[in-house]
Structures are given as structure tokens and as C-alpha cells.
């Protein structure tokens, strides 16, 4: 049947061109952005899953940074304890030296001056050592909780995971003179912590050895906590890497597939354009009939 008001062939060609143009636009967008799912229309379920995984990945990455902050904090505390331990070792040497009967009390007095100065410096390190403007060794961090929810009530809270309930507890004891059973008030000429005489040097040596044991125990606890946090960071990094790979499979453009799709749609578009031109020529046959 020859008609001129309705060109069905042209309508089919136009519809095919519109559908193909959308597919070609999608392929070009995927190639341009490197992302397979650029909007919900591309893959609604994939977009939802991808966004959820993005949230998890970013949370895990931040958790790794927070755990590393915790490690840095603990290493700062241990570094201060190393210096305190060195000073206590020197104080022990002085006490042992003062116990030697070959020295006079005057000479022991010289040793005592260094001894007491070291004791005061140990206390200063404990009160002045800070990380992120927070004191570490003056007793403020006893029973600190590293809370992954970020809602802990302790001085320091670190998110060590992407979900609530992942809690790492550590204990940083004070290393002031008082906490080491070396009262600050005892470090003077009339106090107990001196080595000016043979008798006081003997008593003081025992106290210094006890303080050294306390410092060493604290360093061991911190070392264990650092190792625990380091393994936590490694595990979080591994989880984040696997999640990133999974998200890539869902969200990223497969360039081999997308370039094939683009080439296909370009060929179809050219063919559809040619067919539309042919369809538009069909009504011309009616003119031939009228002229005949």
C-alpha cells in the first residue's frame, strides 16, 4: 500500500536511531570517565552496591590512619621511657659507685648532685612528654580505651575498624617519680633519695632497681600494644584492598567491552541513518504514479 501521510519505515528508523544513540552515549560516557556505572540508570543495583563498598573502603582507610596515629602515640611514649630508663641506669651506676668505701662523703656529695639532677629530669620528662598536645606519662592516660566507634570517653579514641564494637584497650601508666615510688619530695638534701652517704646509697639502690623494673614492664606493655596495632593496620589494609578490587569489578569500565560497544553503536547509527534516508525516499514513488 502506497501512502504519504504516515511513513512507517521512517518511524522505525528514527526509533532505532534514538535507541542506538542512547547506547552510544552510554559507551562514550563510560570510556570518558572510566566508570561503568555513572548513574542509577546504568545499573541501579550495581550503583547501590558500589556506593556501599565505597563507604566501607573509605572507613577502612581512615581506620588505618587512626591506628597508625595510635602507634605513633605509643612510640612517642616509649621513646620518652627509653630516656628515663637510661637516666635510671646512670643513677644506679652512681648509687653503686657511692657504695664503694674508697670514696669520702664529700666525693659522694658530688655524685649525689648528678643523681638528684637526673631524678628531677626523669620527672620533667614524664610531665612534659605529649602527643597531639595530650600528656602521655603523667597519669592522664591510665586505662585508655581506643574505641573504633569514636564515642569513647577516654582521652584518646581511635577508630580501628569500620564497624562499632571493635575496641582495642591499652594501659599507659604514669612514669613520674611518684608513680615509680621515688617521691619528688625525697630528691633534696634532706630527702631519702640521695647517695651522699654510704648508708643512703645502699637504700637508694634498691629503690632505683624497682623503678627500672617498672619502666621495663611499661616498655614491654607498650611494645605489645604497638605490635597488636600494627597487625590490626595490616589486616585493615588487606580488607580495604580486597574491597577496592571488588568495587572495581562492579563500578569500573571494561575498556575492551566498552570500545566494542562503541564501535557497534557507531556502525548501527550509520546504517540507521542510511535506512532513514531510504525510507524518506519511499513517498517519492507516489509522485511517479501521479505523473504516470
Which residues does each PLM region occupy?
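Primary detection of the long, small/polar-rich alpha-helical "axial" segments characteristic
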Residues: 1-292
Amino acid at each position: 500500500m502506497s501512502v504519504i501521510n504516515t511513513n512507517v519505515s521512517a518511524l522505525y528508523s528514527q526509533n532505532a536511531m534514538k535507541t542506538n544513540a542512547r547506547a552510544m552515549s552510554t559507551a562514550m560516557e563510560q570510556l570518558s570517565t572510566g566508570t561503568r556505572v555513572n548513574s542509577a540508570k546504568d545499573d541501579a543495583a550495581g550503583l547501590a552496591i558500589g556506593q556501599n563498598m565505597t563507604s566501607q573502603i573509605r572507613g577502612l582507610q581512615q581506620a588505618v590512619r587512626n591506628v597508625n596515629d595510635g602507634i605513633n602515640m605509643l612510640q612517642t611514649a616509649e621513646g620518652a621511657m627509653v630516656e628515663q630508663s637510661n637516666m635510671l641506669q646512670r643513677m644506679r651506676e652512681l648509687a653503686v659507685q657511692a657504695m664503694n668505701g674508697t670514696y669520702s662523703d664529700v666525693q659522694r656529695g658530688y655524685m649525689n648532685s648528678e643523681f638528684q639532677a637526673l631524678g628531677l629530669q626523669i620527672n620533667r620528662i614524664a610531665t612534659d612528654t605529649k602527643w597531639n598536645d595530650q600528656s602521655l606519662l603523667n597519669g592522664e592516660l591510665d586505662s585508655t580505651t581506643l574505641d573504633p566507634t569514636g564515642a569513647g570517653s577516654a582521652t584518646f579514641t581511635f577508630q580501628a575498624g569500620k564497624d562499632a564494637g571493635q575496641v582495642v584497650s591499652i594501659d599507659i601508666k604514669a612514669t613520674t617519680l611518684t608513680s615509680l615510688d621515688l617521691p619528688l619530695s625525697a630528691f633534696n638534701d634532706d630527702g631519702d633519695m640521695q647517695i651522699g652517704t654510704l648508708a643512703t646509697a645502699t637504700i637508694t639502690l634498691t629503690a632505683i632497681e624497682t623503678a627500672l623494673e617498672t619502666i621495663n614492664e611499661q616498655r614491654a606493655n607498650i611494645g605489645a600494644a604497638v605490635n597488636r596495632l600494627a597487625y590490626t593496620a595490616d589486616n585493615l589494609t588487606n580488607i580495604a584492598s580486597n574491597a577496592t578490587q571488588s568495587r572495581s569489578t562492579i563500578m569500573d569500565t571494561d575498556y575492551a567491552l566498552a570500545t566494542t560497544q562503541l564501535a557497534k553503536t557507531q556502525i548501527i547509527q550509520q546504517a540507521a541513518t542510511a535506512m532513514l534516508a531510504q525510507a524518506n525516499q519511499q513517498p517519492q514513488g507516489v509522485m511517479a504514479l501521479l505523473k504516470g
